[in-house]
From Swiss-Prot:
Active-site residue list: E52
Domain of life: Bacteria
Cofactor dependency: Zn(2+)
Source species of the chain: Buchnera aphidicola subsp. Acyrthosiphon pisum (strain APS) (Acyrthosiphon pisum symbiotic bacterium)
Protein name, UniProt field: Diaminohydroxyphosphoribosylamino-pyrimidine deaminase
SUPFAM superfamilies linked: Cytidine deaminase-like
EC number: 3.5.4.26
Gene assigned in the entry: ribD1
GO biological process: riboflavin biosynthetic process
Annotated keywords: Hydrolase, Metal-binding, Riboflavin biosynthesis, Zinc
GO MF, one annotated term: diaminohydroxyphosphoribosylaminopyrimidine deaminase activity
Family affiliation: Belongs to the cytidine and deoxycytidylate deaminase family.
Keyword Nucleotide-binding: no
Free-text remark on how the cofactor is bound: Binds 1 zinc ion.
Catalytic activity of the protein: 2,5-diamino-6-hydroxy-4-(5-phosphoribosylamino)-pyrimidine + H2O + H(+) = 5-amino-6-(5-phospho-D-ribosylamino)uracil + NH4(+)
Length: 147
């Protein structure tokens, strides 16, 4: 198994929130340790746990030392939910692979910087085009301000 395999799974998971996450984006997350998926999650509904949190809950202690594959950059600010970056750091994840940088100005690269600052290896851009197609409206709204 490789990064592409796990990111494809995260993209598939992101689709599960297609009709329930607006105005938030569809996001999927897979947590892998020793080439075994130990946690999966997706953003199920606006105002509820983000994909990373759902995957971390499923993984529990098995997340420590693992890799998180996320279709969109993890948030690092408090909104309706706490920052996903803090949860990833606290879990002991040591690597995060991100498909797309979040275009939301509140995040846009800040989540990546925060993770790196806390010693987490970050890789970006994996299957970006494939992942972005399931969030066309979100990316358009962030870029133009229009739905």
């Amino acid at each position: 198994m490789n990064d592409i395999f796990y990111m494809k799974r995260a993209i598939e998971l992101s689709k599960l929130g297609e009709f329930t996450t607006a105005p938030n984006p569809n996001v999927g997350c897979v947590i892998v340790k020793n080439n075994i998926i130990v946690g999966e999650g997706w953003h199920e509904q606006a105002g509820k746990n983000h994909a990373e949190i759902n995957a971390l809950i499923m993984a529990g202690e098995k997340a420590q030392g693992g890799t998180a594959y996320v279709t969109l950059e993890p948030c690092n600010h408090f909104g309706k939910t706490p920052p996903c970056c803090n949860a990833l750091i606290k879990s002991g994840i040591n690597r995060v692979v991100i498909s797309n940088i979040d275009p939301n100005p509140k995040i846009s690269g800040n989540g990546i910087l925060y993770l790196k600052k806390h010693g987490i290896c970050v890789k970006t851009g994996l299957l970006s085009k494939e992942s972005k197609q399931y969030n066309k409206g979100f990316f358009k709204r962030m870029k133009t301000g229009f739905p």
